[in-house]
Amino acid sequence: MAEESVSTQFLSNIIGKPVHVKLYSGMLYSGVLESIDGFMNVALSETREHYEHPNNNLLKKYASDVFLRGTQVMYISEA
């Protein structure tokens, strides 16, 4: 049986929890992680959009799910 990598284990453990997703563009999305795949494509619910930092002014709040393309994701952290 192959061991899960630390990053795979981390991502599995935070599904359904609040996260911050930073994009290379500088945008920061905060929401509940609904799903993530091997390409780092991310689906969030209850999402808020900020620029650079969550304490900056809220740019937009989304009522529906938000999908972020994995090639644009710099990092994902637990909120």
UniProtKB/Swiss-Prot annotation:
Annotated family: Belongs to the snRNP Sm proteins family. SmF/LSm6 subfamily.
Keyword RNA-binding: yes
Alphabetical list of SUPFAM superfamilies matching this protein: Sm-like ribonucleoproteins
Annotated localization: Cytoplasm; Nucleus
Protein's GO biological process: maturation of SSU-rRNA; mRNA splicing, via spliceosome; tRNA processing
GO molecular function: RNA binding
Main location class: cytoplasm
Subunit comment: Component of the heptameric LSM1-LSM7 complex, which consists of LSM1, LSM2, LSM3, LSM4, LSM5, LSM6 and LSM7. Component of the heptameric LSM2-LSM8 complex, which consists of LSM2, LSM3, LSM4, LSM5, LSM6, LSM7 and LSM8. The LSm subunits form a seven-membered ring structure with a doughnut shape.
Role description: Component of LSm protein complexes, which are involved in RNA processing and may function in a chaperone-like manner, facilitating the efficient association of RNA processing factors with their substrates. Component of the cytoplasmic LSM1-LSM7 complex, which is thought to be involved in mRNA degradation by activating the decapping step in the 5'-to-3' mRNA decay pathway. Component of the nuclear LSM2-LSM8 complex, which is involved in splicing of nuclear mRNAs.
Any Pfam family the entry gives: LSM
InterPro entries noted in UniProt: Lsm6/sSmF, LSM_dom_sf, Sm, Sm_dom_euk/arc
Xref: PROSITE patterns: SM
GO cellular component terms listed in the entry, alphabetical order: nucleolus; P-body; sno(s)RNA-containing ribonucleoprotein complex; spliceosomal complex; U4/U6 x U5 tri-snRNP complex; U6 snRNP
Domain Sm: 6-79
PANTHER family named in the record: SMALL NUCLEAR RIBONUCLEOPROTEIN F SNRNP-F (PTHR11021), U6 SNRNA-ASSOCIATED SM-LIKE PROTEIN LSM6 (PTHR11021:SF1)
Organism per entry: Candida glabrata (strain ATCC 2001 / BCRC 20586 / JCM 3761 / NBRC 0622 / NRRL Y-65 / CBS 138)
Name listed for the protein in its UniProt record: U6 snRNA-associated Sm-like protein LSm6
tRNA processing recorded as keyword: yes
